[in-house]
From Swiss-Prot:
<dbReference type="InterPro" id="IPR005324">
    <property type="entry name" value="Ribosomal_uS5_C"/>
</dbReference>
<comment type="similarity">
    <text>Belongs to the universal ribosomal protein uS5 family.</text>
</comment>
<keyword id="KW-0699">rRNA-binding</keyword>
<keyword id="KW-0694">RNA-binding</keyword>
<feature type="domain" description="S5 DRBM">
    <location>
        <begin position="12"/>
        <end position="75"/>
    </location>
</feature>
<dbReference type="Pfam" id="PF03719">
    <property type="entry name" value="Ribosomal_S5_C"/>
</dbReference>
<dbReference type="GO" id="GO:0019843">
    <property type="term" value="F:rRNA binding"/>
</dbReference>
<dbReference type="InterPro" id="IPR005712">
    <property type="entry name" value="Ribosomal_uS5_bac-type"/>
</dbReference>
<dbReference type="InterPro" id="IPR000851">
    <property type="entry name" value="Ribosomal_uS5"/>
</dbReference>
<keyword id="KW-0689">Ribosomal protein</keyword>
<keyword id="KW-0687">Ribonucleoprotein</keyword>
<dbReference type="InterPro" id="IPR020568">
    <property type="entry name" value="Ribosomal_Su5_D2-typ_SF"/>
</dbReference>
<dbReference type="Pfam" id="PF00333">
    <property type="entry name" value="Ribosomal_S5"/>
</dbReference>
<dbReference type="GO" id="GO:0022627">
    <property type="term" value="C:cytosolic small ribosomal subunit"/>
</dbReference>
<dbReference type="GO" id="GO:0006412">
    <property type="term" value="P:translation"/>
</dbReference>
<dbReference type="GO" id="GO:0003735">
    <property type="term" value="F:structural constituent of ribosome"/>
</dbReference>
<protein>
    <recommendedName>
        <fullName>Small ribosomal subunit protein uS5</fullName>
    </recommendedName>
</protein>
């Protein structure tokens, strides 16, 4: 019960993406365990994902949530959308995301939608190519978000101010 209260104090949104039963074959038969994939975010640019494995489903989910909280990254957003189109990839999965106008919503499938929701993105157009394995899609999505640069970051890198870059 104490863990539950701590989760509410953090004010983080948590989403369970996938639970999977896996087996290990041993001499005496099969040993079943469960894996869980979760994402956690504050709805304001911080997002993390976690993958947990245990003999019982609740324990796997709890492990995944803890790992997600430990692996959070910060993403700079532009009023609920992205600054520019971005691509991300992880193994066989590739994702493409582009900013969308107000009122568009999150046009994304499954695992990518969950990541974008908890990150605080409200308007985005996206597409997943290649493998749609949830773990790879989540990692590719986070990769794309991390590599997105804000105009202020680009201006600082070039030694200019934001108005000069925007033209």
């Amino acid at each position: 019960m104490a863990k539950l209260e701590a989760q509410q104090k953090d004010d983080l949104q948590e989403k369970l993406i996938a639970v999977n039963r896996v087996s290990k074959v041993v001499k005496g038969g099969r040993i079943f365990s469960f894996t869980a994939l979760t994402v956690v975010g504050d709805g304001n640019g911080k997002v993390g994902y976690g993958y947990g494995k245990a003999r019982e489903v609740p324990a796997a989910i709890q492990k995944a949530m803890e790992k997600a909280r430990r692996n959070m990254v910060t993403v700079e957003l532009n009023a609920g959308t992205l600054h520019h189109p971005v691509k991300g990839r992880h193994t066989g999965s590739r994702v493409y995301m582009q900013p969308a106008s107000q009122g568009t919503g999150i046009i994304a499938g499954g695992a990518m939608r969950a990541v974008l929701e908890v990150a605080g993105v409200h308007n985005v157009l996206s597409k997943a190519y290649g493998s749609t394995n949830p773990i790879n899609i989540v990692r590719a999505t986070v990769d794309a978000l991390v590599h997105m640069k804000s105009p202020s970051q680009i201006a600082a890198k070039r030694g200019l101010n934001v108005d000069e870059i925007r033209g």
